[in-house]
Amino acid sequence: MESSLFSPSSSSYSSLFTAKPTRLLSPKPKFTFSIRSSIEKPKPKLETNSSKSQSWVSPDWLTTLTRTLSSGKNDESGIPIANAKLDDVADLLGGALFLPLYKWMNEYGPIYRLAAGPRNFVIVSDPAIAKHVLRNYPKYAKGLVAEVSEFLFGSGFAIAEGPLWTARRRAVVPSLHRRYLSVIVERVFCKCAERLVEKLQPYAEDGSAVNMEAKFSQMTLDVIGLSLFNYNFDSLTTDSPVIEAVYTALKEAELRSTDLLPYWKIDALCKIVPRQVKAEKAVTLIRETVEDLIAKCKEIVEREGERINDEEYVNDADPSILRFLLASREEVSSVQLRDDLLSMLVAGHETTGSVLTWTLYLLSKNSSALRKAQEEVDRVLEGRNPAFEDIKELKYITRCINESMRLYPHPPVLIRRAQVPDILPGNYKVNTGQDIMISVYNIHRSSEVWEKAEEFLPERFDIDGAIPNETNTDFKFIPFSGGPRKCVGDQFALMEAIVALAVFLQRLNVELVPDQTISMTTGATIHTTNGLYMKVSQR
């Protein structure tokens, strides 16, 4: 997915802010969501534990410090400064950060500043400004995203810059060709989706509730392991140290993005702070596992004298991306290859799992849409598994997924850092080093951009038209980002979601467990705080 992976939405410098008059849009009415904000008064949940990060800094202390540091600061950008309230701090520090960003968009307009002591962020909720920033690489680099995820990605292309990024992207993109996707649909996407349905049978038989967010996360981890390096995590069936390490590393990246103080930049502290010691052990295990897979695959490629002989080369025994990259005989170190694969592992796993979670949630709340989706599956597939050529015929399911990604984009924000002074559309000035937070969530939910923006309406996208993307919507729809650093795996991710949802809906009915409060929190994607519990039954 888009390589701004780990909660670019929440930064290590989030804080409270002082207000200035604005000359932008007047406040708009708040949208009504079926999901409750994590800043609402909590109600009983199915689980008592919350995944929401807790800061050791109290909101009152943070407010006082920030206002003291920010007061009197010169600002010639022409960008208004948002004024946060204490209730917003919980979401700024480890919660659903995109919710207060959305609230302030309605108050201050499509661009505003969050001042955080010596550092501040420009929040962008306007498609034209987003287009300008995303298309103008290398004027705008990854910045904060690279800082919080380098411990895991190393020099992987997800966070690489300059010539290294150009070289690695050129090496990776050819591996995602049409023939590869057609093979993976049958051998991996369908098989893993069938395995998921199989694992849901006990729940269908006894009527007990199942956390579908967790199940989709497990399934997509299995998919990405097989697709990338022909490695079966088998996380739907078993637990293993490698699986635990993957989730530990993902959690650490999310926590780093919300830590007020980036203490993990100090090597000495990383050796004694328990959280950092655990994260380092996890990353070491993941890297050793991937390095071992690379070494074994390289040995096979060398022994067989394998070499790519056409643009859509696929090894029949092992169609993985790793096999393609090694057979290309490109001069690249095992460490660089490892970092590139880890970039794709994290991006491909986190995003698709969240897309499926929220799509199923939305369908469960809309019986008409759910019925249409199942009718399409029955008509197109006629009881069999989807093949590559069937995907283009699953038009309504595709639009349901598109609409889900509009309402719940992954990631909900993208971060860039200005490398040179620039003037944004609207004549707003930014200086070198300015961090810019593009709120995909705001753009996708803005009533200035979309009619009935808060409603789940798959039909808003022409079912017989082109699949919506940043180009044909003029950056109004950017779930995979846009510009030169757009997600390289957008087709892979969309096809995986279509196949998984089709297989699921073909075999099972689904019902949302009533009376559960589904709160949101920010990570690499939009998570629930306590899971998404549903009941499934055989069709």
Curated annotation (Swiss-Prot):
Disruption phenotype: No visible phenotype, but lacks lutein and accumulates high levels of zeinoxanthin and beta-xanthophylls. Triple mutant cyp97c1, bch1 and bch2 is paler and smaller than wild-type. It is an enzyme of class 1 (oxidoreductase). Its main location: plastid. Residues 1-36 form a transit peptide. Its cofactor is heme. Keywords: Carotenoid biosynthesis, Chloroplast, Heme, Iron, Metal-binding, Monooxygenase, Oxidoreductase, Plastid, Transit peptide. GO terms for cellular component: chloroplast; chloroplast envelope. It is found in: Plastid, Chloroplast. GO terms for biological process: carotenoid biosynthetic process. Heme-containing cytochrome P450 involved in the biosynthesis of xanthophylls. Specific for epsilon- and beta-ring hydroxylation of alpha-carotene. Has only a low activity toward the beta-rings of beta-carotene. The preferred substrate in planta is not alpha-carotene but the epsilon-ring of zeinoxanthin. Possesses a major beta-carotene hydroxylase activity in planta when depleted in its preferred substrate alpha-carotene. This is Carotene epsilon-monooxygenase, chloroplastic. The lineage of its organism: Eukaryota, Viridiplantae, Streptophyta, Embryophyta, Tracheophyta.
